[in-house]
């Protein structure tokens, strides 16, 4: 009898679920890391600023939807937003990009589609929720917020300029950046997969049923879970899909929408660059909009 055979069946089941989730998620994390490396090396804020529309509404919607063309993982989105703001990209363009870029890009949408059994339904609802939050934040910043959102004496950060490198060195730097992002993201993915597998095996079904019977409590619980786990947007759909049978669509949708825009690591990074007053408004607006959106989806569907 091997050492594995001597383990309790619950431990073996947890391990099997953990491996199945992480094996599904890793290819998308790898692709996302490579794309992020390409953006870091080849796409500069100056290039983005060149394409900005002239009117305020156009800039809000530009920031909301440009993430389709420039997919960015939320793990590195905050420093990118800081660079945009330093290049005089308005906050009502930069912040919507912060919210939607990790969600509406093709990689994350396809990962969500795959995680939920090749269903466009959840991927579409996730994208719509993200767009709704982005537009509301853009309107708030564009028409009601009157001050800069950056810290006046923000912490200095080390920023890379790759423009002077030869083509071969740029390609090398793409892979350097991608490897850094892959391993940085991987640690969060491991904890998320482990947590999801433990819930499925060790938390009694009656407890999950009682939680899911109260929609607002289930939604708030999974929103908190998304905040604490700090998962990468290329991988969180697989965690969400594993929780679907226990909590239902609306709470899982809240988990998927809020995770890329509001988690521990993002808030900590925001504190380096952005004013505390803005961060508190950002957290409040995002939380309320995602909560109301998820409740409405639960009622309608």
What name fits each language-model region?
Residues 38-43, 202, 264-265:
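Structural signal for the C-terminal ends of transmembrane alpha-helices
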Residues 24-25, 63-69, 228:
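Interfacial helix-start motif at the membrane-water boundary
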Residues 31, 62, 66, 75, ...:
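Short glycine-rich loop/turn motifs that provide flexible caps or phosphate-binding loops at active sites
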Residues 2-34, 46, 50, 124-223, ...:
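Selected transmembrane alpha-helices and immediately adjacent juxtamembrane segments
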Residues 70-128, 203-274, 278:
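Membrane-interfacial helix-loop connectors
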Residues 35-66, 208-213, 239-240:
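Membrane-embedded helical hairpins/re-entrant loop segments and their flanking transmembrane helices
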Residues 24, 28-31, 40, 44, ...:
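Short helix-loop boundary/capping segments at the starts of domains
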């Amino acid at each position: 009898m091997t050492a594995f055979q001597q383990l309790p069946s619950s431990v073996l089941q947890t391990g099997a679920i953990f491996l199945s989730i992480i094996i599904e998620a890793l290819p998308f994390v790898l692709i996302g890391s490579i794309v992020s490396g390409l953006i870091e090396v080849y796409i500069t804020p100056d290039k983005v600023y060149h394409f900005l529309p002239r009117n305020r509404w156009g800039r809000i919607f530009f920031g909301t939807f440009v993430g389709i063309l420039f997919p960015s993982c939320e793990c590195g989105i905050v420093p990118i937003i800081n660079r945009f703001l330093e290049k005089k990209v308005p906050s009502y363009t930069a912040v919507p990009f912060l919210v939607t870029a990790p969600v509406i890009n093709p990689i994350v949408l396809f990962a969500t589609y795959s995680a939920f059994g090749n269903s466009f339904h959840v991927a579409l609802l996730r994208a719509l929720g993200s767009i709704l939050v982005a537009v509301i934040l853009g309107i708030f910043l564009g028409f009601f917020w009157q001050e800069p959102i950056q810290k006046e004496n923000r912490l200095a950060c080390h920023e890379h300029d790759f423009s002077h490198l030869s083509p071969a060195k740029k390609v090398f730097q793409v892979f350097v950046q991608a490897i850094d992002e892959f391993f940085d993201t991987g640690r969060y993915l491991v904890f998320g997969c482990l947590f999801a597998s433990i819930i499925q095996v060790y938390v009694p079904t009656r407890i999950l049923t009682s939680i899911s019977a109260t929609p607002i409590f289930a939604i708030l619980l999974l929103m908190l879970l998304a905040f604490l786990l700090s998962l990468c947007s290329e991988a969180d759909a697989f965690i969400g899909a594993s929780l679907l049978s226990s909590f239902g669509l609306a709470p899982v949708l809240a988990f998927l929408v809020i995770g890329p825009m509001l988690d521990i690591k993002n808030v900590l990074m925001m504190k380096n660059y952005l004013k505390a007053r803005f961060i508190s408004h950002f957290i409040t607006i995002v939380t309320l909009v995602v909560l109301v959106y998820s409740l409405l989806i639960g009622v309608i569907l």
